[in-house]
Amino acid sequence: MALNIADLVEHAIDLVPERVALASDGREVTYAQLEERANRLAHYLREQGVEPGDKVGIYSRNTIEAVEAMIAVFKIRAIMINVNYRYVENELQYIFDNSDMVALIHERRYSDKVANVLPSTPLVKTVVVVEDGTDVDFSAYGGIEYEAALAQSSPERDFEDRSADDIYILYTGGTTGHPKGVMWRHEDVWRVLGGGINFMTGEWVKDEWQLAKEGAENPGLVRYPIPPMIHGGAQWALFQSLFSGGKVIMHPEFSGHEVWRIIDDHKVNVIFITGDAMARPMLDALEEGNPKTGKPYDLSTLFAMASSAALFSPSIKDRFLDLLPGKIITDSIGSSETGFGGIGIAEKGKTLGGGPTVKIDESTTVLDDDGNPIEPGSGKVGMVARTGNIPLGYYKDEAKTKATFREYNGIRYSIPGDYARVEADGTVTMLGRGSVSINSGGEKVYPEEVEGALKQHPAVFDALVVGVPDERFGERVSAVVALRDGEQVTLDELMTTARSKIAGYKVPRAVWFVDEIKRSPAGKPDYRWAKDQTGLRPADEVYNNGDGNGAAATG
């Protein structure tokens, strides 16, 4: 049984070759066409010397060619490297070097950056350039145009046998440090992200053909992963569809109105988002309606919206539940180091304080500092941990591998640093990443919980919470806030709103107002940037109880 990503896609290709696999505005690619084009690119890469285990970078927005390239890389047992298209040159150089990349497939719009980085990354010998409507010159480094590479190569599927042990690498976002390459076996990542388990029960899919056969027997779902494919959640929404003969909508840019237009035009069934950063502009656009027709968007085919990997505030969920009655809205937990961890169904007005409250499967648990499971309903906070199908470690980073992948009581766990509370019914309420938690007066404060409380105020569009040095408390809980256009709010008003949702010691006591909150393309927070903002200038407002120290707002 070859539980390999390329094999699983090929099963669907063999059963539903005539179905549309990928669609973008004005263009569709069937499974048969996807097979031919991916085979051609795979043969081209092999002809250029790319061997099994070699690293191939994909530096692209959400395009059909990016998907073809991923599959081509897997077909020849090479390793795909996800390259963040917002990276500046020194960040690109880090990824190229750290991954030991030997080939690169990129959109033409990034040619200037590639030209500046390649002289310092001599391992990269092959560059394929995807036309994207721009005219940036790539002749300086001898890149070949994507369609030309395909035209000169074989369309046949005549590759060597693959293995479930082939390596898949997913680079983390790097918002709290350098990006790290998380190494998975193909079978393991399929089990926890690709449909190899039932996400509600944790039960294994036993037959490698099961997803393709079930998909062939039913009308294929139309899925629209909105986050960029550099993000693991978007990649695996894509592959879940390709394994089961579904149709995936690819769109390179994000805007609230574009999302609803695409759902309307393509009759989408399921969309995937990453929390508030995408949800807020989508909500605003949904409330405004279609600007071209003056009518609401037709969302009759949409039945589910799935959020993962970023804070999805209760107030945002409630607005969606009001505007999308009858639709299923889910919030999932997970990370590059654990894959899927648990899922919750949104319910109006339901919040226990913190992040999402989810039902976990038998492979996910919450451990105390000694590696023992936290008792449900104890009120204790512990580390989210996953066992079973987990990564091998970080690429070329033994120290961080030892820190994250630990053994307790003879069991190997992945413990990426997320903290949670186990409720009396066994569900888990996420609190946040320990590496960005704030220690204020001996109390640990998790930014996501505070951010969710601040976003309850109608004037707040986005917010990040960090700790700043404080002589009395060690760290002062502080907020960097972006307001909605035309809105104004005081720190006192923000504190009042937050205090109604969280304990007083968690309430921000200083605020910096900014035009826009910096996030990754996938919507993940950049806490280093937020911390920098607090050092660039004095706070716009600081709470002070009269002792000059800005004492804690205890309510």
Swiss-Prot record:
Protein name in the entry: 3-oxocholest-4-en-26-oate--CoA ligase
Keyword Lipid metabolism: yes
Function of the molecule: Catalyzes the ATP-dependent CoA thioesterification of the sterol 3-oxocholest-4-en-26-oate to yield 3-oxocholest-4-en-26-oyl-CoA. It can also use beta-sitosterol, campesterol and 3beta-hydroxy-5-cholesten-26-oate.
Renumbered residue ranges of the record's region Disordered: 525-555
GO molecular function, a single term: acid-thiol ligase activity
Catalytic reaction annotation: (25S)-3-oxocholest-4-en-26-oate + ATP + CoA = (25S)-3-oxocholest-4-en-26-oyl-CoA + AMP + diphosphate
Entry EC number(s): 6.2.1.42
